[in-house]
Amino acid sequence: MPRRLIDISVALKSGIASDPPHMLPQIEYLDHHQTAPAMAEYMGVSVDQLPNGEYAAVEKVQISTHNGTHMDAPYHFFSTMNHALKPGGEPSWRIDEVPLEWCFQPGVKLDFRHFPAGYIVTPGDVEAELKRIGHTLKPLEIVLVNTAAGAKYGQDDFVDSGCGMGKAATMYLLERGVRLTGIDGWSWDAPFSTTKAKIAAGGDASLIWEGHRAGREIGYSHMEKLHNLELLPPDGFEVVAFPVKVHRASAGWTRAVAIIQE
């Protein structure tokens, strides 16, 4: 049966508004001619003796594990997890401990592009969307959340765009066996700017990072800065998203791909 692969990741790129200013990735590109002198010196030859005076193209990067499309480990959210499953919980898994079984499963897309920036998705919203698409969640399905932020990637207001998943909505997914989710916004939660405004207006500090904090109750992982989710059907596809195995890290860069059987 033929299949179609859809890249649902963004490229690591410097010079665009992909993150807050203090978190932007830096990439230095060295071309074939720039690296030739060092190789020629090491080998004891002249640059002219290398084919066309060239050696290798190389990049130097200064990035966080949370730049680009990446997967957060439970350890990113809180130092312990699974308090709802066992007394006292247990140490949170790092990215090199996330079960590979979580990362290659059938996918489900929730379309929340109509919600305004800063809106916090509720369990009722999730139920209504599942009813609309005619889908019943199954354990280990990968739930992808399509927001208005996806179309803003690289624009100045990207970080402040799109809705976010509240703690209750996240728990709704986890209690049904979901262990990996993803979103095309900068964060799984609502933008920090709108959360800050709500707290300043008298809101509760528990709003801070509430979706992430669900991982303290039931350990899970989510992907952030996904892309092209509007190209996916509501269900009937698979997601492959293995994170880079960074030792004891809170996250790992991920090349996420959706597979549609046609």
Which residue ranges define each predicted feature?
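Active-/binding-site microenvironments in catalytic and ligand-binding cores
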Residues: 1-262
